[in-house]
Structures are given as structure tokens and as C-alpha cells.
Amino acid sequence: MSAPLRIRENGIDLFVRLTPKSSLDRLEGVETSADGRSHLKARVRAVPENGAANQALERLVAKTLGVPASSVSVVAGGTSRLKTVRIVGDPEALAQRVEALG
């Protein structure tokens, strides 16, 4: 299974499948879709209105990976379940933290 991320010069892009309106906020590991792409499964309590679920996802990823919330942002898939989250920081260290979640 491939890692659910892409290494960038100044960080990583993390591919996430988000489920809003969950009973709790959590990252649930790596999943592979039918087309063979990997993504990290995430659940948040926030509702998908006015970007609340995206903001909750950004906070959850920042807390889980131990990075400042300001270095995490949803850059693609704002209204979709499948999102790309950009995390600024040391790419190798971030990749290791994500792989440990798998």
C-alpha cells in the first residue's frame, strides 16, 4: 500500500477522506480506495457547513502530528469528502509521523 501523501519541498500534501458529524474527532488509519489510491480516514464532530468540518480537520491533523495549526490547510476538495491537506514543515519528519498512523 502506498502512503497517503506527496512529499513537497516545504512539507507534505496529505490525502484524507473526511466523515463529518461523527461522534468524536479522530484519525483512523490508512485506507485504499477501489482505484488503488491511499488516503487517511478522518472523522470530525463538526457539521459540513461554512467550512466548519474543514477547520476541525485542520485542527485535528495539527494536534495529531504535533505541528502548529497555522501550518495546516485544506488546499483541495473543500466541499468533497476526499481532501488534500497541505502541512508545512520538515517533509521527512512529517512523512514518518503520518506513516506511524497507518
Swiss-Prot record:
Gene3D superfamilies: YggU-like. Signal peptide: none annotated. It comes from the Bacteria. InterPro entries: DUF167, YggU-like_sf. Pfam families: DUF167. Belongs to the UPF0235 family. This is UPF0235 protein msl4154. It comes from Mesorhizobium japonicum (strain LMG 29417 / CECT 9101 / MAFF 303099).
